[in-house]
């Protein structure tokens, strides 16, 4: 009788372990430094975290960088880790534009969603995850401030990934 109980207990522990293992998010080797990103409908293929595209009839370039502010989570509920990070882009003028970018980890290739504009010359602070929401914190300027002023107003924006799109959540 004791042997039966021990065998049943071992069997149940193994089954529970297998179920737990397969219920956890699986890690996929997403390398956000070497992905294609969609910004304003255009593709920018980053290599080692950077892309340079010459602007026709100009000596300027569109330079796009991946920042080191990022977080990993299963944003689209497919049990595979995704990455949310910040992209910086200079289009040849005085501005440095910041975007929230998400790459889904469904396969070995990067599958990015359309990036969301955060601001011009803002000061990124962090990206967090809470209840599958992406929370981006950064400093910005007041509307009446000059672009030469340092950003000093704390901004916190929240996003969800739905149907392979970033959707902003406006807190009530």
Give residue ranges: language-model regions.
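Acidic, small-residue rich beta-repeat scaffolds with periodic aromatic anchors
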Residues: 3-52, 123-172
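Repeat-based blade/solenoid architectures
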Residues: 60-69, 116-124
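Short consensus segments that form the blades of beta-propeller domains
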Residues: 61, 90-94, 145-151
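Structural signature of eukaryotic scaffold interfaces centered on beta-propeller domains
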Residues: 69-77, 127-129
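Short beta-turn/strand-loop junction motif enriched in small, turn-promoting residues
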Residues: 71-73, 88-91, 141-144
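Acidic/hydrophobic-patterned starts of short beta strands in beta-sheet-rich repeat architectures
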Residues: 77-87, 134-135
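Short, surface-exposed beta-strand/strand-loop-strand elements in extracellular ectodomains
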Residues: 98-104
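Beta-propeller fold detector
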Residues: 111-120, 168-172
